[in-house]
């Protein structure tokens, strides 16, 4: 999956990455539908044609931002456990995914915020929602596997566990501010403690 990386350069100081960052901030502030190319041009101090040099449409900007957020989350699920991990059972993999997801949210806070506000109003948004649902199913399957192994209590439905856990993780976008008291590592520890300690079999 691609990340929000610069692929073309135009005027100094206004590369693709910089334009996309401003666009995502505007989408989050005003809503995607209410944000026009003209508004972005004014914020950037560029002409509309200069923006179109980098992006063919506003939809392309949205697609790039959502792909960055989703790609980061999908990569966490696909990533192997670190070398030297004590176990590769399902609950260890689930913990690895939860920690990784927290880091993705912190590292890509604006893009993930945008993803969580998608409602399926455009083809781009509908594709993103399809990928997000597929991600949710993978998390549910991992929870169910950990329950089958006996690592997690099984009296709570796996889908409910997945939704509640990621509801907590996703809430980070509403209150987290970079440079605060807790960094990504500490937040990940907190999430794992709250989400898994009450679910583990003694």
Language-model features and meaning:
Residues 1-30, 34-43, 59-63, 68, ...:
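Basic, helix-initiating cap at the start of DNA-binding domains
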Residues 64, 75-107, 162-165:
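Hydrophobic alpha-helical connector segments
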Residues 93, 97, 102, 154-174, ...:
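Hydrophobic alpha-helical segments that form the core
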Residues 13, 17, 21, 25, ...:
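Generic detection of well-ordered alpha-helical segments
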Residues 44-55:
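Short hydrophobic/aromatic patch on the recognition helix
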Residues 71-78, 103, 107, 124-149, ...:
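Amphipathic alpha-helical packing segments from all-alpha helical-bundle domains
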Residues 103-107, 114, 136, 141, ...:
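Amphipathic C-terminal alpha-helical segment
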């Amino acid at each position: 999956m691609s990340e929000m990386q610069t692929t073309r350069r135009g005027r100094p100081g206004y590369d693709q990455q910089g334009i996309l960052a401003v666009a995502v901030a505007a989408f989050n502030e005003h809503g995607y539908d209410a944000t026009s190319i003209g508004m972005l041009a004014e914020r950037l101090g560029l002409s509309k044609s200069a923006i179109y040099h980098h992006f063919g449409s506003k939809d392309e900007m949205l697609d790039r931002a959502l792909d960055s957020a989703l790609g980061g989350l999908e990569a966490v699920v696909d990533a192997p456990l670190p070398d030297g991990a004590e176990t590769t059972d399902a609950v260890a993999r689930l913990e690895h995914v939860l920690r990784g997801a927290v880091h993705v949210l912190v590292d890509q806070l604006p893009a993930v915020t945008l993803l969580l506000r998608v409602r399926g109003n455009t083809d781009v948004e509908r594709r993103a929602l399809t990928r997000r649902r597929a991600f949710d199913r993978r998390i549910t399957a991992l929870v169910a596997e950990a329950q089958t192994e006996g690592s997690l209590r099984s009296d709570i439905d796996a889908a409910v566990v997945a939704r509640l856990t990621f509801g907590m993780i996703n809430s980070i976008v509403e209150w987290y501010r970079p440079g605060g008291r807790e960094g990504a590592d500490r937040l990940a520890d907190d999430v794992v403690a709250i989400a898994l300690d009450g679910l583990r079999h003694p």
